[in-house]
Amino acid sequence: MLLLLIPVLGMIFALRDARAQSVSQHNHHVILSEAASLELGCNYSYGGTVNLFWYVQYPGQHLQLLLKYFSGDPLVKGIKGFEAEFIKSKFSFNLRKPSVQWSDTAEYFCAVN
């Protein structure tokens, strides 16, 4: 059985105005068996219009954009089978993947702008 260790960190982008915001991620380290489903929680505190992002950093590589939400359909499809759902009433943008692979081992970052 292969296990995935997925460290999860939060990131905040600065706004152009003075309103405060923050991001919190529920899962700081996740260990999963290969083919298990993954859900990483991300909540933000900001009442205005937001742009939401998930980034991934694979071992030894640079940070790369996994998916983003600006407006429209709240279910966002990303690369490599990842998706995230924007739920405005809960201030959440949770990342999901129905079946993780060993190659998904990485650090995942939720961000709001």
Curated annotation (Swiss-Prot):
Signal peptide as annotated in the record: 1-20
Superkingdom assignment: Eukaryota
Domain Ig-like: 21-113
Keywords annotated in UniProt: Adaptive immunity, Cell membrane, Disulfide bond, Glycoprotein, Immunity, Immunoglobulin domain, Membrane, Receptor, Signal, T cell receptor
Family matches, as InterPro entries: Ig-like_dom, Ig-like_dom_sf, Ig-like_fold, Ig_V-set, TCR_variable_region
Cystine connections: 42-110
Subcellular location(s) per record: Cell membrane
UniProt-listed PROSITE patterns: IG_LIKE (PS50835)
Gene Ontology annotations for the cellular component aspect, listed alphabetically: T cell receptor complex
KW Disulfide bond (keyword) present: yes
GO biological process: adaptive immune response
Glycosylation site residues: 43
Pfam families named in the record: V-set
Subunit structure: Alpha-beta TR is a heterodimer composed of an alpha and beta chain; disulfide-linked. The alpha-beta TR is associated with the transmembrane signaling CD3 coreceptor proteins to form the TR-CD3 (TcR or TCR). The assembly of alpha-beta TR heterodimers with CD3 occurs in the endoplasmic reticulum where a single alpha-beta TR heterodimer associates with one CD3D-CD3E heterodimer, one CD3G-CD3E heterodimer and one CD247 homodimer forming a stable octameric structure. CD3D-CD3E and CD3G-CD3E heterodimers preferentially associate with TR alpha and TR beta chains, respectively.
Biological role stated in the UniProt entry: V region of the variable domain of T cell receptor (TR) alpha chain that participates in the antigen recognition. Alpha-beta T cell receptors are antigen specific receptors which are essential to the immune response and are present on the cell surface of T lymphocytes. Recognize peptide-major histocompatibility (MH) (pMH) complexes that are displayed by antigen presenting cells (APC), a prerequisite for efficient T cell adaptive immunity against pathogens.
The protein's name in its UniProt record: T cell receptor alpha variable 8-1
Originating organism: Homo sapiens (Human)
